[in-house]
């Protein structure tokens, strides 16, 4: 039975801080139909609630998308530099009558911003959750916006068949695929309900997992001892049916894709090769020699090439994603490991564990432009719009490299912060998954400290 939504929606416009001047707190009514608009101080806020049901009808207990559009009233253009905050809560009739509805709503927003566990709205539209991979056979769900005694609240715990190793999620974050090497399977977690929904057979010793850009297929690296079982298993990401196993070579496998999802590139560490797989037919197209010990592989959308870092040879081999041939070999130093690219594909950062440094490659001309000192034994790197964040195994410090400071003839700007009391190495064996996660606004990262489980 269809039910209209008749609760109040409090909208608070934030400039660069929660206390920014000119903030407007208003209550809006929505009956689940059309678009509601609020116009004030030259700003238009449009609210739309859209059912996710196939028939488009809003029903109690079902999912819906709540969308806000904030525009300049005069020009109709999107308003820059604001961060909307919104809460859904039952209308407080007595408070509205006593204070006036606007002041009543504003006072409640002030309470909600304190993130007290005893004063929460019916629905916090700004909320998000963090999933934390544990070393035992489980995944924890944390609410970072609610704390008890200064410690963030654990919302749920999801039990798995075996300890996890790596994970990946599609853009809509509705599922999480988790590799379990000891179970020869990939766990599928429903991240809307925080429960395990399936375990899919994924070949022998599944470790690395990756979704191709169009998210149609899930690729699983099989670090199997038997040559015929070492390679990748391909799974349909929607039906969860295994489609094919492709033997590629011996050793650990890293996986990258062309931007158009036509080619998959799989490194074979012990064979010193990269296998190129045609995704349409799921057949091996080419096998390239890329050094003695390829440890990482990354794709640049700017140069339309794949970069393969070899730890033993100290080289980065550039493979053209169109011609599928080696375009250049960049000579660096022994000890190379993980590599990644900035979102625009311009700057590639490859970590050197032996030298405690990060080498920066400019993808516009495939050349080395910087060597930057970073945290001891760097082993993980992630990117936001503005920074590269680098985690070291032998240091509690996380290094930040300012991407805007990079370029030929320029001096890189770096800084750091402590992420816990001790270095990650002291925690013992760690999962392959990154301990760094980019925040949803792409302006910060969350850092896990495996030593004290924070």
Model-derived segments and spans:
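Bacterial N-terminal signal peptides
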Residues: 8-20
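N-terminal secretory signal peptides that target proteins for export/translocation
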Residues: 1-4
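Predominantly soluble domains enriched in secretory-pathway, periplasmic, or organellar proteins
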Residues: 25-454
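Short helix-onset patch at the extreme N-terminus, typifying the N->h transition
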Residues: 6-9, 384
